[in-house]
């Protein structure tokens, strides 16, 4: 079943501008309180100007352009401007540091970067130290450094016409984005996302929360994440609704933003719910228009009930990952919800629980959650330049192995049991244990290292490092945490350190992580 009808993203935006015209499409609020608003017509014009900017800088169909930005209008302009000319967006997690960002640049083959002044010094260092393919950097800030190969995004964009100058042939099978996501291996993998994937995500996610053109969808989720892009932005735009993008989450400001913009739909992760609950109660807690709060794992029933009662909302559970593009299992609009179930499989998908031999399990038995979709359409196409990793998780007939465990009941409701192997869920970020262990192992005093996730009342899981030192060495907590802060993103830095004489291992020599939790 083809619900896209051959419509790529360029056609989508041209149609949206024609149909919705002066209706508000996008509202962006910065951390400083600056608000920018764009109608569908204005937003399409900004997207066209941005596409023309990239064309003048030599970007053509198939070229990769990296974005290292916080939530801002420029992210939206670039995302769809690149898509209009057949180029490929490579969003970089705005919290990553030098080594991690450089690795993504190198492995994505990005030739141009759009970033802001706060991240520019890091990329100066990367260009000096690493052999990347970067030809040019665009800065979104007004003030520019006196460096060659750097230009002002805003100045260049404003010089461009509002109609598209370069319109190569496009197909819905063309790649629109490569989104690097942490996995169970030591390095992130590039998830290849097509025009069809994004168009489908818009229709599917709009269906999931019954979006209409009079809705206002507010999110504080980072734009470089799949949930902001495919659950929120694509859904809102596909429905002709208004999309509100807040630069950064603030527990103190969030409810006021929901009220100010008269949001009808928003999304929350457990860390947000917990920090909202510790804010002082207010008589305005239920003074809002929210009808759905999209929710992602993992919350106790007591926490859920307390949140819903205090704020007068209901949670719409959704389960998915970058590779599934959308929440392929979830609550359905208008249907009964069965907590703590993660819901039922959505349209265009199949879901099974399978055993270690890849055989389907009956209701009530725990196994791996597996999803069947169409690669490049309803699930990701492949891992970029990594056929071995693709083959490991994606079968030829479209069955995707999530690596997560769960079970289903007799009525088709699914239940999540545990996270995928060696992953830590920390405040909405997926952190690979192996990646951290490889970084920490480079410390000259450390002989052996393992990191595990331990329960945290606010951020789902905290990171604890267990280390064995080289003989005769001593290591202070201050020295250890300073080393981590210098070599990894802040959200990956362990919260706890324990120095041990040895680590528990099985007969194969593998560390038994569960003995350390």
UniProtKB/Swiss-Prot annotation:
Keywords: Ligase. Pathway: Amine and polyamine metabolism; carnitine metabolism. It holds the Pfam family AMP-binding. GO terms for molecular function: carnitine-CoA ligase activity; crotonobetaine-CoA ligase activity; medium-chain fatty acid-CoA ligase activity. The keyword GTP-binding does not apply. It comes from the Bacteria. Its EC number is 6.2.1.48. Gene3D superfamilies: 3.30.300.30, N-terminal domain of ligase-like. GO terms for biological process: carnitine metabolic process; fatty acid metabolic process. It catalyses: 4-(trimethylamino)butanoate + ATP + CoA = 4-(trimethylamino)butanoyl-CoA + AMP + diphosphate; crotonobetaine + ATP + CoA = crotonobetainyl-CoA + AMP + diphosphate; (R)-carnitine + ATP + CoA = (R)-carnitinyl-CoA + AMP + diphosphate. Catalyzes the transfer of CoA to carnitine, generating the initial carnitinyl-CoA needed for the CaiB reaction cycle. Also has activity toward crotonobetaine and gamma-butyrobetaine. Belongs to the ATP-dependent AMP-binding enzyme family. This is Crotonobetaine/carnitine--CoA ligase. It comes from Escherichia coli (strain ATCC 8739 / DSM 1576 / NBRC 3972 / NCIMB 8545 / WDCM 00012 / Crooks). The lineage of its organism: Bacteria, Pseudomonadati, Pseudomonadota, Gammaproteobacteria, Enterobacterales. The gene is caiC.
